[in-house]
Amino acid sequence: RGVCYNAKNGGYIDNVPGTWSGEGRGSFPSGGTTTFEVDDNAALVEENFNDSEYTGFRISSAHSINDDWEMLITHLDQDLSADGVFDYDPAKGDLLVSRFVEDTLDDSFSQTSLTLEGRLGKLDALYTGAYLERESEQQVDYSGYANVGAWLPYYVCNYTAYNLCGPATVSVELLDDNQRTTHEFRVSSNEVSDLPFSYTAGVFIDESILETENDYCYLGTDHPYASAGTWAAYQANNPLPGAWSREGRVRRPACRFFNDLKRTEEQTAYFAEMTFPVSDKLDLIVGARKYDLDVDYTGQSKFGYRGSNVANGRDYDVSGDHSADPL
């Protein structure tokens, strides 16, 4: 059996004209002696800008191996593309918002699963397993950070005078890569069993890997105001030496902070249950469970100062439970 689909959803949020600067926000200078560069979103103004499109397929095949065994194989594949945001700014009006960085999302996954079900004499047996791969790339307008980001003026103004401030526009670029494998095997007694009780027992195994990159890009660092101070111009933001990195890539100068992380999780669960009939109306059930979980966390959080490209940040290969040092 197979099915293909394509669904296009129209938007209902309007991205309307607006301006943005650091003036009057967060820890930016106040008092009227600072010149602020003002950003506008004229290039991004659009009606109904939060549209999305789903494209995918699902195929499955069931097979009777013999009188005792059956097999089912299924594969799913989907791509999602979405633009805009799905909330609005009441200060702008109903279903209206002003965004200053293009909001985009591309999300794709594929999953293959297998189920085997059958009989081994006096036992019913079941195995089911699946493998998932998912990758998403997203860009988000994070300019609201200017309202709370205490250090943003350091990056976009002329340090140390702070009388010239570049745009307070911020974008976040996100990449997530996820892999997950699951297995479950269980057996249970069936109607031909001659035991005085019935039982079920099995094991479940789940292994997952998440690799994620989050780049926080202060777009005002590219403005002449940001390099008009007493410090040198920004350099590219290198990863921490020796720490795990998904690609080891150097971020452009505007991306002053990034997370580059890998999280692995392995869990194993054992379970068993026995049912003893005490009478026609009463059963005694005895069960046991054992569960093991192992989580590992490696990678880095990196931030770049002005001037020299020094190794500022946190190396989770060292502090992420790989030593006695706390996070």
Kindly give the residue locations of the regions a language model identified.
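Solvent-exposed loop segments that connect transmembrane elements
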Residues: 10-47, 83-100, 141-173, 215-260, ...
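Outer-membrane beta-barrel signature, preferentially recognizing the C-terminal barrel domain
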Residues: 97-112
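Face-selective signature of the C-terminal outer-membrane beta-barrel domain
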Residues: 74-76, 109-136, 167-308
